[in-house]
């Protein structure tokens, strides 16, 4: 069962403006990355379903985070079917994210009052997802849909939209500012926030610093 309510999840996404996206088969690495993000000001974290037994790792992370990072909202990403969504909800996922929009997932999450953010690449997909009860829709892959102008043009007719942007997002002022100015609700960030060499070197302080910088750029762009 989710620890945080839908309103709490959405409020944290909006307030911080960033959702780190990460997976590693080594649970200790996952713990260190989550802790580093937490210390950097992150309060919403997406663990992606991208490896064998990923759900088992997630279940342990939920229990660990409850004690070590009590304000961190953990959710599951790369969820493409209703069965997988149900599995992660049982393990305590506070939100579900997918690279695609699967209308079968929406009612599973809606019954639990858990946010479902599906991947969308057009106005039609975004609108259909909203009709299915998705409060935050994920534009993915961001680097292929037309850039910040796409978001701005979507927000014109669908001005009530809450768009989470993922793909081709970097923790730099030059990259983040145009997306924030275009009106995104929050951004999802993965490999650029967690370079392989940084993780391999166990340089958790560097990840904390990157998170702090990125959150600062987002806050600045919103002013």
Give a label for each model feature.
Residues 17-22, 45-47, 74-77, 96-97, ...:
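Hydrophobic faces of well-ordered beta-strands that scaffold small-molecule active sites
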Residues 38-43, 89-96, 110-117, 131-136, ...:
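Glycine-enriched alpha-helix->loop->beta-strand junction motifs that scaffold or abut catalytic
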Residues 43, 96-105, 138-147, 183-204:
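Glycine-rich phosphate-binding active-site loops on the catalytic face of alpha/beta enzymes
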Residues 21-25, 48-52, 77-81, 101, ...:
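Active-site beta-loop-alpha junctions enriched in small/polar residues
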Residues 73-75, 81-119, 123:
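Helix-adjacent hinge/juxtasegments
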Residues 81-91, 124-133, 169-187:
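Catalytic cores of alpha/beta
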Residues 43-52, 84, 89-91, 112, ...:
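Glycine/Thr-rich beta-alpha phosphate-binding loop at enzyme active sites
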Residues 1-75, 79-83, 87-91, 181, ...:
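Conserved N-terminal beta1-alpha1 strand-loop-helix module at the mouth
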